[in-house]
Amino acid sequence: MDLSASRSDGGDPLRPASPRLRSPVSDGGDPLRPASPRLRSPVSDGGDPLRPASPRLRSPLGASRPVVGLTAYLEQVRTGVWDIPAGYLPADYFEGITMAGGVAVLLPPQPVDPESVGCVLDSLHALVITGGYDLDPAAYGQEPHPATDHPRPGRDAWEFALLRGALQRGMPVLGICRGTQVLNVALGGTLHQHLPDILGHSGHRAGNGVFTRLPVHTASGTRLAELIGESADVPCYHHQAIDQVGEGLVVSAVDVDGVIEALELPGDTFVLAVQWHPEKSLDDLRLFKALVDAASGYAGRQSQAEPR
């Protein structure tokens, strides 16, 4: 069966979402001292909390290295004598960012409101929507498959809100595995909930934490093709995949089964999502380096826009 679903191009990627999906700067002083009160809320003037704040609010860590936010898990975790809810992310993700020249900041799920989302995005120069458990199928109008993970509505809502805010700002975005699915669903797409039912094999997820390496082929003329060439062997661990493609997105890679392995938004803004796990191949930093370079450009544009 050909899974490379018809792409939608010409839709508005920033259109209002379905209601069910809504859900200090360094001045040379001590970077750990309390910020000036005027920096505490980018929406204190009653403006749009999702628009970029004044550039002087954008990077508490300085402008030399771009700040990249990575979404994270919020799960019950055992460590030492503790068995508690905790936010976490495998170290490979933020090592990819730091090795590529960025500063990584983790963004565990929290209650969503426009002010909190705006405050977070004001501190970032790029966003990574990371891998994790399956999206709630209700987000794309389906009932759950027996193999679909128990929903994490808090993480879903948090990532949808961050992603939509980042897209509105023109902020660079990289999606990884689940992050590809978040991007697709946020723009109106749907998912195959369990690939083995369609393909007749489990080659995309071997199980027990073992990553499968699969060849993918890129689409000529896409950003991804410019970055990695015509093909690559990539580490995969997913049992779900893109079905109908979200509005404005183009398919930039497929595998030998026709499964969509990458999506991107055309245009000047870096918005790229891969179904595989580049953090598991840190000897190849091309995707992370491209994101960090785009984040540096975003930071520079914000700095140039600052009133003199």
Swiss-Prot record:
Any one biological process term the GO annotation gives: polyamine catabolic process
EC number: 2.4.2.-
Disulphide linkage map: none
Crosslinked positions (Isoglutamyl lysine isopeptide (Lys-Gln) (interchain with Q-Cter in protein Pup)): 289
Residues annotated as catalytic: 177 (nucleophile), 277, 279
Region (Disordered): 1-62
Keyword Protein biosynthesis found: no
Gene3D superfamilies: 3.40.50.880
Biased composition (Low complexity): 13-24, 31-42, 49-61
Lineage of the organism: Bacteria, Bacillati, Actinomycetota, Actinomycetes, Mycobacteriales
Superkingdom of origin: Bacteria
Gene source species: Mycobacterium tuberculosis (strain ATCC 25618 / H37Rv)
Glutamine amidotransferase type-1 domain segment(s): 78-301
Pfam families: Peptidase_C26 (PF07722)
SUPFAM superfamilies recorded: Class I glutamine amidotransferase-like
Protein name as catalogued: Putative glutamine amidotransferase Rv2859c
GO MF annotation terms: gamma-glutamyl-gamma-aminobutyrate hydrolase activity; transferase activity
InterPro entries: Class_I_gatase-like, Peptidase_C26, PuuD-like
Alphabetized UniProt keyword annotations: Glutamine amidotransferase, Isopeptide bond, Transferase, Ubl conjugation
